[in-house]
Amino acid sequence: MGQIQLLDEVHAQRLQQARHLFFDQGDLPEGLVDPLIVRSWERCRRFGIGETSMTPTTNAMDRIALKTEQERNRFLLAQGRPIMEHVFEQIRESGSMVILADANGLLLETVGDADFVNRADRVALSAGASWDENLRGTNAIGTALSEEAPVAVLGAEHFLEHNSFLTCCASPIFGPDGRLLGVLDISGDYRSQQHHTLGLARLSSSIIEKRLFESVHARDILVCFHSRPDYLGSPKEGIAAVSPDGQVLAMNRAGTSILGIRQVDAVRRDFSMV
């Protein structure tokens, strides 16, 4: 038996114990599951969701309404679609799908292996459905939006029992102005989970953010920087949009993180003084 399989079995046992403590006894399963998952479970309890609650298993909106929302999010879709397709090429035939959702958890577009897509459709994991946490319970899309952080939700970490066949990894996408725009998610069957998937989701969301920033500031002077030269040209590089007179017009999240400043503190300052 391989080490990964042993770790998966240990995780499953700890998760079963955690669910018993939380759902049957009302106690917090401290140390048994990720604190982020526990926070989400607590939010779901406050929402009044039960672990066996039945949520809508059909799309919440018709094609016309979905088209309207896709048009509303056309900027995100234009920059996100090529990345979705590239990610899917990396995981094709692994029983997975790639999802792009908006800031409210509405699934805008999906691409995936047909067999898994058909299974996912039975729990409304398809375009036009909302996976907001207050509707679907703990899930990577809704929880990543609530936490504004990358999230992996594996099997029975999902609040609702009928979603426990899923393993989902999602990473939020922020716009050039720092506003939360949506989330990129990679979902598959819990039994065939890949341990690199969360990293792939994080990298993909970073690439989309970079594309969004460069698109908005295509006519500005872009200054790229990083403390490590080998990171230049990667999604980890800082980018500042600068006016001809050297004023910072905007800076991406990677840039403000590198410099340890807030975006609002970088804007309208001379780049040489940032």
Q: PLM features: residue spans?
A:
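PAS/PAS-like sensory domain cap-loop motif
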Residues: 113-116, 120, 255-266
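Terminal output helix/cap of sensory domains in signal transduction proteins
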Residues: 141-142, 265-274
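Intrinsically disordered, low-complexity terminal regulatory regions
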Residues: 1-134, 139-152, 165, 174-245, ...
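Short, glycine-/Ser/Thr-/acidic-enriched flexible segments
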Residues: 158, 247, 255
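Helix-to-coil/beta transition segments that act as allosteric "coupling" elements at the rims
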Residues: 157-175
